[in-house]
Amino acid sequence: MEKIVAKKKFGQNFLKDESVLQKIIEAMPNNDNKIVEIGPGLGDLTKFLVDVKSVDAFEVDTDLCKVLQNKFEREIATKQLRIHCGDVLTAWKSELIEESYDLVANLPYYIATNIILKALADPKCKNILVMVQLEVAEKFCANDGDKVFGSLSIITQSVGEAHIVVNVPPSAFEPQPKINSAVFLIQKKSDRSDKDFEDMLRVAFTQPRKTLMKNLSSTYDKAMLQEIFEKLSLAQTIRPHQVSTNDYHQLYKLARSLDGTRERTEC
């Protein structure tokens, strides 16, 4: 068989360390959900997944689709595996699959954050177990007060719980990336928070080294913010990463309430 060369445009790094693959399988939540795998590559993780559950795999690389179709001919025939050739983000414009599912994947780094946020927003997705760049995993799993605590951490904490399963060195891949990776798990308890809340978070963390007051006052009324900060006992010098997830939710609720009150008063 012709050797498959990893393509940079698809961010391909094939996971070859079977001990890491086994740890991913061991970390999978125990349930009856289907599995969605994005970027199955050469099928190194897929071969473990189809042994335990039925899998829908989404692969954008047509060359790899052919490899997968040949490699898993039996599993495809028994409907243990369905391979979808094409861009998963295009497929996600409608329903990805009909059933409840867990996302389990070694994600291409260049679209990892976007895919995780899409999965968090998808009510059919119940758990997310993925390999990503270590820096990205730390942001999703950060706790209140951590230096890397930010909007991704808050969005994640708002819908469930997250933790890093295992750190993965470059030597586990072929070709070897220049960065460290990690597998992490998000267990969803509810659906993703609303868009307006996430818009506020983006403003709050626009310049992480600035104060939260300064960042928010670029978009929101400063007098209103001062009133909210006082109600929540937040110092006006506090920085974005020093505010808890709960306080961000309270801040958002008060901002909506006060905005609505002022609009009615002005009318």
Swiss-Prot record:
<dbReference type="InterPro" id="IPR020598">
    <property type="entry name" value="rRNA_Ade_methylase_Trfase_N"/>
</dbReference>
<keyword id="KW-0949">S-adenosyl-L-methionine</keyword>
<dbReference type="InterPro" id="IPR023165">
    <property type="entry name" value="rRNA_Ade_diMease-like_C"/>
</dbReference>
<feature type="binding site">
    <location>
        <position position="13"/>
    </location>
    <ligand>
        <name>S-adenosyl-L-methionine</name>
    </ligand>
</feature>
<feature type="binding site">
    <location>
        <position position="106"/>
    </location>
    <ligand>
        <name>S-adenosyl-L-methionine</name>
    </ligand>
</feature>
<keyword id="KW-0808">Transferase</keyword>
<keyword id="KW-0963">Cytoplasm</keyword>
<feature type="binding site">
    <location>
        <position position="15"/>
    </location>
    <ligand>
        <name>S-adenosyl-L-methionine</name>
    </ligand>
</feature>
<protein>
    <recommendedName>
        <fullName>Ribosomal RNA small subunit methyltransferase A</fullName>
        <ecNumber>2.1.1.182</ecNumber>
    </recommendedName>
</protein>
<keyword id="KW-0698">rRNA processing</keyword>
<keyword id="KW-0694">RNA-binding</keyword>
<dbReference type="InterPro" id="IPR029063">
    <property type="entry name" value="SAM-dependent_MTases_sf"/>
</dbReference>
<dbReference type="InterPro" id="IPR001737">
    <property type="entry name" value="KsgA/Erm"/>
</dbReference>
<dbReference type="InterPro" id="IPR020596">
    <property type="entry name" value="rRNA_Ade_Mease_Trfase_CS"/>
</dbReference>
<comment type="similarity">
    <text>Belongs to the class I-like SAM-binding methyltransferase superfamily. rRNA adenine N(6)-methyltransferase family. RsmA subfamily.</text>
</comment>
<feature type="binding site">
    <location>
        <position position="59"/>
    </location>
    <ligand>
        <name>S-adenosyl-L-methionine</name>
    </ligand>
</feature>
<dbReference type="GO" id="GO:0003723">
    <property type="term" value="F:RNA binding"/>
</dbReference>
<feature type="binding site">
    <location>
        <position position="87"/>
    </location>
    <ligand>
        <name>S-adenosyl-L-methionine</name>
    </ligand>
</feature>
<keyword id="KW-0489">Methyltransferase</keyword>
<dbReference type="Pfam" id="PF00398">
    <property type="entry name" value="RrnaAD"/>
</dbReference>
<dbReference type="GO" id="GO:0052908">
    <property type="term" value="F:16S rRNA (adenine(1518)-N(6)/adenine(1519)-N(6))-dimethyltransferase activity"/>
</dbReference>
<feature type="binding site">
    <location>
        <position position="39"/>
    </location>
    <ligand>
        <name>S-adenosyl-L-methionine</name>
    </ligand>
</feature>
<comment type="function">
    <text>Specifically dimethylates two adjacent adenosines (A1518 and A1519) in the loop of a conserved hairpin near the 3'-end of 16S rRNA in the 30S particle. May play a critical role in biogenesis of 30S subunits.</text>
</comment>
<dbReference type="InterPro" id="IPR011530">
    <property type="entry name" value="rRNA_adenine_dimethylase"/>
</dbReference>
<dbReference type="GO" id="GO:0005829">
    <property type="term" value="C:cytosol"/>
</dbReference>
